[in-house]
Curated annotation (Swiss-Prot):
The modification N6-acetyllysine is found at K222. Component of the chaperonin-containing T-complex (TRiC), a hexadecamer composed of two identical back-to-back stacked rings enclosing a protein folding chamber. Each ring is made up of eight different subunits: TCP1/CCT1, CCT2, CCT3, CCT4, CCT5, CCT6A/CCT6, CCT7, CCT8. Interacts with PACRG. Interacts with DNAAF4. Interacts with DLEC1. ATP binds at G42, G94, T95, T96, G411, G482, E497. This is T-complex protein 1 subunit gamma. Its main location: cytoplasm. GO terms for cellular component: cell body; chaperonin-containing T-complex; microtubule; zona pellucida receptor complex. The modification Phosphothreonine is found at T430, T459. Keywords: Acetylation, ATP-binding, Chaperone, Cytoplasm, Disulfide bond, Hydrolase, Isopeptide bond, Magnesium, Metal-binding, Nucleotide-binding, Phosphoprotein, Ubl conjugation. Disulfide bonds join C366-C372.
Length: 545
């Protein structure tokens, strides 16, 4: 075979990379992503300004929001971005630390791969380390009393201090706590807190941030359909529909042949009678407000107005669900089936206000709302979007604590405690595995190290003294004060994080590192046919889909 042409198995326009080259490529991609985000950790974090393709601006220091906007080529970088999204959906906080940790885990593994250690050895050490990390975290966690308002505000505050909104921290903490407490829903001993669905954030530019508040009820961006309808109703009876109050046209196309002209008037009359019947079904229940997801014809408006009923049309389905939860109404699909128990009487006030140039309907002062609207005011759209992102994080933290009331110390303290525990355990280990195992402990120190770097203090001196501190008894709550860059006891500073967030961060970071270490071959697929003719033989870059 030596003299013959090499046998081509893969087609000519695919490119294959394998072995060490791929592994170091993946590790570098992950490190690059981690470096982008590194300065966004802690209370002294920097903001990033991103321009999207449409020319809009995003200004944020939320790890997930930054990575969402970045377009990357390398497949390993894509999976890094994916984990920050998972973290955001799962626990809503810790998106920055999960990326930094995963990047660091891969970075310490590179050294072993260079020494020809097999990736599987590194992986099994990482897995073992993860189990020990989880058990150590659970050991240092403390239970929390969720009914104590000050404690809860303190926890939310430690999540908010790293964000833009920290200037208004007490306002933001109260908003987040009230909103989450409102949408908390218990049945048969099962807690359900659905923030996405029932706690809506409405942003209205104008005013100042101090004007923001949580409404005990719902606000929608709609006006009444007829100018003479009432705009201020106390204790309204509310009917919610998801059908239209218009003449129903048949599903299939129908043709009517008219021979006499009286028939024509009869047809119009039938349409009118149909609408009148619909309205009468509603009017029987004597509601004050009718809200529907579909349209309301002029004639129906006329009948409703004569009965002194306010009508609001084309409301979003999600808003309608929220109104139903807030005032206790049921959404009805057919007006003729309306019954007394479908009417919502839980709201204390319906009023329509003009804010800026637009009209908003407020349904507030609900007796026992299970949905709420957070009204945000602020100078510009960019600020509002950032404040909204921060509030979402704060609400998620609050939700995590309510669902799983366990806390671990923040400020890099839990990382150092876990790292110390791992180092102690590795002393008893024999064989090659102890080195990658010890490296995990080293990787965990990236969190306190980054906190120290971001506030401009001396990294080496502080980290060494922090390590020394953690070797002493009962010092596992010592960490870095991100504001000043000094070492403090987190118990005194009152910076705590939910255990759920930390567990998820560690699991995700280690799993991702393991996943990327497993890859030893990248085959990039075909290029488009058009490209092929123009650049014959030029293989696409690794990672181009």
């Amino acid at each position: 075979m030596m003299g013959h042409r090499p046998v081509l198995v893969l087609s000519q326009n695919t490119k294959r990379e394998s072995g060490r080259k791929v592994q170091s490529g993946n590790i570098n991609a992950a490190k690059t992503i981690a470096d982008i985000i590194r300065t966004c950790l802690g209370p002294k974090s920097m903001m990033k300004m991103l321009l999207d393709p449409m020319g809009g601006i995003v200004m944020t220091n939320d790890g997930n929001a930054i990575l969402r906007e970045i377009q990357v080529q390398h497949p390993a970088a894509k999976s890094m971005i994916e984990i920050s999204r998972t973290q955001d959906e799962e626990v809503g906080d810790g998106t920055t630390s999960v990326i930094i940790l995963a990047g660091e885990m891969l970075s310490v593994a590179e050294h072993f791969l260079e020494q020809q250690m097999h990736p599987t050895v590194v992986i099994s050490a990482y897995r073992k380390a993860l189990d020990d990390m989880i058990s150590t975290l659970k050991k240092i966690s403390i239970p929390v009393d969720t009914s104590n308002r000050d404690t809860m505000l303190n926890i939310i505050n430690s999540s908010i201090t790293t964000k833009v909104i920290s200037r208004w921290s007490s306002l933001a903490c109260n908003i987040a706590l009230d909103a989450v407490k409102t949408v908390q829903f218990e049945e048969n001993g099962r807690k359900e807190i659905d923030i996405k669905k029932y706690a809506r954030v409405e942003k209205i530019p104008g005013g100042i941030i101090e004007d923001s508040c949580v409404l005990r009820g719902v606000m929608i961006n709609k006006d009444v359909t007829h100018p003479r309808m009432r705009r201020y109703i106390k204790n309204p009876r509310i009917v919610l529909l998801d059908s239209s109050l218009e003449y129903k046209k048949g599903e299939s196309q129908t043709d009517i042949e008219i021979t006499r002209e009286e028939d024509f008037t009869r047809i119009l009359q039938m349409e009118e009678e149909y609408i009148q019947q619909l309205c009468e079904d509603i009017i029987q229940l004597k509601p004050d407000v009718v809200i529907t997801e579909k349209g309301i014809s002029d004639l129906a408006q006329h009948y409703l107005m004569r009965a002194n009923i306010t009508a609001i049309r084309r409301v979003r389905k999600t808003d309608n669900n929220r109104i139903a939860r807030a005032c206790g109404a049921r959404i009805v699909s057919r007006p003729e089936e309306l019954r007394e128990e479908d009417v919502g009487t839980g709201a204390g006030l319906l009023e329509i206000k003009k804010i800026g140039d637009e009209y908003f309907t407020f349904i507030t002062e609900c007796k026992d709302p299970k949905a709420c609207t957070i009204l945000l005011r602020g100078a510009s759209k960019e600020i509002l979007s950032e404040v909204e992102r921060n509030l979402q994080d704060a609400m998620q933290v609050c939700r995590n604590v309510l669902l799983d009331p366990q806390l671990v110390p923040g400020g890099g303290a839990s990382e150092m405690a876990v790292a110390h525990a791992l180092t102690e355990k590795s002393k008893a280990m024999t064989g090659v595995e102890q080195w990658p195992y010890r490296a995990v402990a080293q990787a965990l120190e990236v969190i306190p190290r980054t906190l120290i770097q971001n506030c401009g203090a001396s990294t080496i001196r502080l980290l060494t003294s922090l390590r020394a501190k953690h070797t002493q008894e009962n010092c596992e709550t010592w960490g870095v004060n991100g504001e000043t860059g000094t070492l403090v006891d987190m118990k005194e500073l009152g910076i705590w994080e939910p255990l759920a967030v930390k567990l998820q961060t560690y699991k995700t970071a280690v799993e991702t590192a393991v996943l990327l270490l497993r890859i030893d071959d990248i085959v990039s697929g075909h290029k488009k046919k058009g490209d092929d003719q123009s650049r014959q033989g030029g293989a696409p870059d690794a990672g181009q889909e």
